[in-house]
Amino acid sequence: AQYRVSEQNPVPIARNIIAAKIQASKRVLQRQIRNYGENEAIQSAVDALNISLRQLKGAAELDVVRGIEGDAAARYFCVFGQLLSEKSGFSFDGRNRRPPRDGVNALLSFVYSILGKDISGALQGVGLDPQVGFLHADRPGRDSLAQDILEEFRAWWADRLVLSLINRGQIKPQDFVTEASGAVSLKAEARKLLFQALQAKKQEKIVHPFLGEEVEIGLLPYIQAMLLARHLRGDLSEYSPFLMR
């Protein structure tokens, strides 16, 4: 069923996932306004994300969904640097990767990569093929479905974790090394601290928005994989991506 839906009708699942991603990104920005007061640039990005959500409702083709997602991500990362406290010593001029060229991007890439591996394992655990996605195109060696599900967790889980480590001063600009190529990576001590922060986060509990039950955050990749498998088997009429209320 996974292969058939991926080929014949990937749009409903892709659209649901991206709607959840944009909502979660919007909430990260709104939280900043709530905590630190009105900010014109951030409010303008929130307004743009609301427009993206409206456009998404009518998107009937995969390329349109991908285009909306790309625009929304660009607007979000355009103001992401304003979520960093000035005294942290970090700056952010937009998303870059392969390789990351600054500390913030190195942290984001590192956390995304760990969560992506967790999601791949969870998908295999419920009998799904991590390489056959709905939103991301299949490419040799890429776990496209894991990348799909990761979209639901980027803002709410990964980005907020990175922001909190930086803004609390737990990770500092001197915790990174820059290679001759310009690639920036974490020093061993900071990497250990990041792992510990991720592990601590995984042990926190939340009420799952779809199941209505208290679960550990670390179980979320498995729960979403299970909900997707149940939808593909026909037990659930649609796939409910992860989105905290």
Regions found by a protein language model. Give the residues of each.
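Active-site helix-to-loop segments that bind/position phosphate- or nucleotide-bearing substrates
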Residues: 2-245
